[in-house]
Amino acid sequence: MNSVQTPSPELTPEVESKTGQYSVTLISLGLFSYCLYWLQQNESSQQMWLMLIGGFLGLALYHASFGFTTAWRNLIVNRRGRGLRAQMVMLAVAVCLFFPALSSAELFGEEVRGYIRPLGYSVLVGAFIFGIGMQLGNGCASGNLYHAGGGQLRAIPSMFGFMVGGLWATADYEWWTGLPQFAPVSVIEETGLIPAIMINLALFAGIALFTIWLEKRTHGEVEKDQPLSEIANWRRYLQGPWPFIWGALVLAILNFATLAMTGRPWAVAVAYPLWGAKLAMLLELELELDFWSYWLQPGRETALEESLTSDVNSVMNAGVLLGAFAAAAMAGKFSFQWRLPILHWIAALLGGVMLGYGATIAFGCNIGAYFGGIASGSLHGWLWLIAAFAGSIVGSYIRPLFKLDTKTSTRSAC
């Protein structure tokens, strides 16, 4: 008697792709959930909530392709300002949320303070160096995190360089901050709450209108954001892509949530020198960090002794990375991308060193100094923006030395 064998059904490429997507999504969400649980059990509920906020920041950055590096280069090279206009919306929402709370120095019964820093050479030079590093490293402080979370391993040398540059800058920090500088200026204190809001909104509108004028003059029309009619169903919330405006709103709201949770705005770059110092200690490098003025400031000396899971900025950065991992998985776009020409790897490492050094002496990066500084009403945030944008102009035009494209896609990424 002949037995008839029924051929086993073969999975179509579409089914295999869906299966892989679901598997990676489960892994990413499982890992994120475990980290949240571990923090709640071993650190505190606040650390758990901060990682969750970081996760949503990573999700928003990834799905909206919301960034600073490519958005600025898009304006510099292509005369397209959609990304920069989205940043102005983000800042406008932020000042409307932040300024009233910072004016009263209280939010939900807890003390809050902004980033009000001096205006001097350290900000001017540091931000300029950072701007060049953005373009060479193909990312900023937050961009490297969400690139790495999405599987783009090109972010790794840039992040390593960021740690090295940040640690290097802590050795020179006393010299830079000892240079002549103007005292910190808070627009809220100088003008009052309502005038401060109106002045900033007028500046944001002016920048947005300038990009529209420049874009129309160059292209005859303005590049539009993704219309809401294309957001077909609830899946788009989880799988993306999002319009830029969604990313702008979510980032502003979550930065405000960070202010409520920690008493100060979101920051990213400040974690990198700490990671570099921890690595140096692990490698038993004799750097005598205890004698560097940077590490003698309140909170920083204890950060060297404590676990990274106790550090607010490190926990939020890890959340951004894990959130981007989950976002890429849900979008079906997660894959390891590491095949790059050697010059690209060199540019990423060099750019990372410039990012770390520049951010540390300039009191922050695109998040802490630009976003957080302007949202705090500090004039140093505007000085940082001008200097970093000038650096990005230089960086954009030296990219070809490393065989990096100067043209950008229609979607902005950090």
Regions found by a protein language model. Give the residues of each.
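Membrane-interfacial helix-loop segments of redox and metal-homeostasis proteins
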Residues: 2-414
